[in-house]
Amino acid sequence: METLIAISRWLAKQHVVTWCVQQEGELWCANAFYLFDAQKVAFYILTEEKTRHAQMSGPQAAVAGTVNGQPKTVALIRGVQFKGEIRRLEGEESDLARKAYNRRFPVARMLSAPVWEIRLDEIKFTDNTLGFGKKMIWLRDSGTEQA
């Protein structure tokens, strides 16, 4: 649980996620502002259905990605690598996520793009502020944490 708490605290301070999807051997990545839900261990993003990455995702798809800062020194590198599943939200689930997203990013009220959830199943958090190459790993299904 301590690993997930540390990861969640760091993710709550960031705001841009990069995620990648593949379809028929073709890969594509995209960036978006995100809202992180520590209880569900999921990102919520907005993206138009007409985008290449949304078209490749369809209603749901496997996904991998990163969240990282831009430190000027190696000793301060912190970042997350993850894999999971992306899906477009519908109905009440979408409405609730959009309200929370709009609280974090008020400018999003002007956007009509659908809400998507990236459910994280595996997270690797690198935190060089704890020592060079320090890694923490969290896995959803097994509840496993490695520090």
UniProtKB/Swiss-Prot annotation:
SUPFAM superfamilies: FMN-binding split barrel. GO terms for cellular component: cytosol. Belongs to the UPF0306 family. This is UPF0306 protein YhbP. It comes from Escherichia coli (strain K12).
